[in-house]
Regions:
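N-terminal pre-Walker A segment at the start of P-loop NTPase domains
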Residues: 1-15
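A short linear-motif detector with a strong N-terminal bias
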Residues: 6-10, 34-37, 197-199, 247-250
């Protein structure tokens, strides 16, 4: 087992800084009791803040994690879309030759035209051309996502091309709250986010976060709800998972692992109780395709491998002394 503080330190220094921030992606499964997992989740908040990553905490008791579209919506609800759009707008204006003054960080089209004493229509033409280059022609993002981000940036810059109703509909579409997709026809978006396109939307979201100046996305998936019994007489009932739903969730995680080469700058930390290893009905044995990707059948019983996909949290191991030797230069690292 590896102590929580030791593993968190290792994860930040060796996995995130040396791999994820350099364009990598990974999925880690952390097994521990409630106290250890709560400590891990809190420490991930600090880690994300230290590395300027966007943290997306997903709790299976509140979000149906077996559905990839609901997983995307859960991540999207934690994103400040307006702030990201403003960051891109300011960057685009700068690259177009019209940098936003520090004293006017939220300057709109007419404000910027007045500052630079130019025709607003000509300025809009130049900025729209740059929007096309930075956003719409970036094919690392799927088309619907590119269109949505282009419209949000145009709305943030107040170009007059996007109405309040359309901008609000886009924000609702991103978080799964849009009732009528027909509200987005004028924006050339014709379908909702569902399980068939949500994975591509998640790829695109990570790319957009990077454009907005963040170093990456850190997702924490708290799946302890999979193994909790049904509670009777509770007003605020959490989501209950059947065995089929649990296996569907494992299938989504398996796909996430297989798609790590398509993600960049994204780390997923999956938090699970010890039952994940022991429960044959709901644990890793219930879905062999996932087990084959993460389970360490051949491992050292006396030493923990922090690089492994499956990490057992608990009493401190000798990892702490190893890290200390590494910092002093007495060791070449793990």
């Amino acid at each position: 087992m590896i102590g929580v503080s030791e593993y968190t330190r290792f994860f930040e220094d060796h996995c995130l800084q040396l791999y994820i921030l350099d364009g990598g992606a990974t999925v880690k499964f952390c097994i521990g009791d409630d106290a250890d997992l709560e400590t891990l989740l809190v420490s991930m908040e600090t880690t994300a803040s230290n590395l300027k990553m966007v943290l997306a905490p997903i709790d299976a008791s509140r979000i149906k994690v077996q559905m990839i579209d609901q997983l995307f919506f859960g991540v999207a609800r934690g994103i400040d879309w307006n702030t990201l759009s403003r960051t891109i707008v300011n960057r685009v204006c700068g690259s177009a030759g019209f940098p936003i003054p520090n004293e006017h960080p939220k300057a709109a089209l007419t404000d910027l035209a007045e500052i630079y004493s130019c025709d607003p229509r000509e300025l809009q033409r130049d900025i729209n051309r740059e929007f096309q280059k930075v956003i719409f022609k970036d094919h690392n993002m799927v088309q619907d996502f590119r269109i949505a981000m282009l419209r949000l940036c145009q709305y943030e810059f107040r170009t007059g091309q996007v109405s309040d109703v359309e901008a609000e509909a886009i924000n609702q579409w991103l978080v799964g709250e849009l009732k009528q997709v027909s509200l987005l026809r004028s924006a050339r978006i014709f379908r909702k986010v569902d399980r068939t396109n949500a994975r591509g939307m998640l790829f695109s979201l990570v790319r957009w976060i990077n454009k907005g100046g963040y170093s990456g996305l850190l997702v924490t998936l708290d799946l302890r709800q999979f193994f909790k019994p049904r509670v009777v007489g509770t007003d605020d009932l959490p989501i209950l998972y059947s065995r089929a739903a649990v296996i569907d969730a494992y299938e989504s995680l398996r796909q996430l692992i297989d798609n790590t080469d398509e993600f960049k700058n994204m780390a997923t930390v999956v938090c699970l109780p010890p039952e994940f290893l022991n429960d044959r009905m709901r644990g890793v044995d219930a879905y062999q395709a996932l087990k084959l990707r993460i389970y360490d059948e051949v491992r050292d019983q006396s030493r923990d491998n922090p690089f492994g996909s499956l990490v057992r949290l608990g009493a401190s191991s000798d990892l702490g002394s190893h890290l200390a030797r590494t910092e002093k230069g007495d060791d070449n690292g793990c």
